[in-house]
């Protein structure tokens, strides 16, 4: 039991630390990726077909049974309420305004835009990043929670050896993942 608890505790503490750094102590609400879709439709469509967008589904009983068995997990168990899984399979779990459960916060199921780009409750509102304000300044939205530069530390909160699906010699290849991308990237229409 000790072996399982300590790594999971490190994951939770690490996530809280990085999220705390990205918001500089401010609390911003999570709004869900559907809000990002309004302005970033092509990116949203690209992301919605990724493993990250649909990663919550693997927590359901019977999903990826072979991989779960190989990892020492019970393939028949429902992991959709397991706190040690929700940290990396939902958006904002354990954070103020983050994922609570499927019924309460269905818009935060899966790894959404805000897991990488920060909780959007402030930066998608007036006077910041809105359809009415197409000339917002990037520095202004970064100051209110947008994470503009994705770092290896942010990714490694979940992509690490604490995952039951990788071995102890697993190394997350940030360069390859960044090159591959989580969603297609399209040029912005307006200068920021």
Model-identified regions with their sequence ranges:
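N-terminal secretory signal peptides that target proteins for export/translocation
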Residues: 1-7
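Generic low-complexity segments that are intrinsically disordered, proline-rich and/or Lys/Arg-biased
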Residues: 8-9, 188
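Sequence context of c-type cytochrome heme-c attachment sites
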Residues: 22-110, 114, 120-149, 169-192
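A contiguous, mid-protein "functional segment" used to position or interact
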Residues: 148-166
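Bacterial N-terminal signal peptides
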Residues: 10-20
């Amino acid at each position: 039991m000790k072996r399982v608890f300590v790594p999971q505790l490190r994951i939770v503490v690490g996530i809280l630390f990085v999220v705390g750094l990205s918001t500089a102590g401010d609390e911003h609400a999570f709004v869900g990726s559907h809000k990002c879709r309004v302005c970033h439709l092509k990116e949203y469509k690209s992301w919605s077909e990724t493993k990250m967008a649909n990663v919550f589904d693997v927590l359901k009983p019977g999903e990826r049974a072979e991989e779960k068995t190989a990892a020492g997990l019970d393939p028949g168990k429902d992991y959709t309420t397991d706190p040690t899984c929700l940290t990396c399979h939902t958006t904002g779990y354990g954070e103020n305004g983050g994922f609570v459960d499927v019924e309460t916060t269905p818009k935060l199921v899966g790894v959404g835009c805000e897991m990488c780009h920060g909780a959007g409750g402030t930066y998608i509102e007036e006077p910041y990043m809105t359809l009415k304000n197409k000339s917002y300044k990037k520095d202004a939205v970064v100051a209110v929670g947008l994470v503009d530069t994705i770092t290896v530390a942010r990714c490694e909160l979940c992509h690490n050896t604490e995952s039951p699906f990788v071995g102890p010699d697993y190394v997350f290849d940030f360069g390859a993942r960044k090159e591959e991308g989580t969603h297609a990237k399209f040029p912005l229409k307006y200068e920021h």
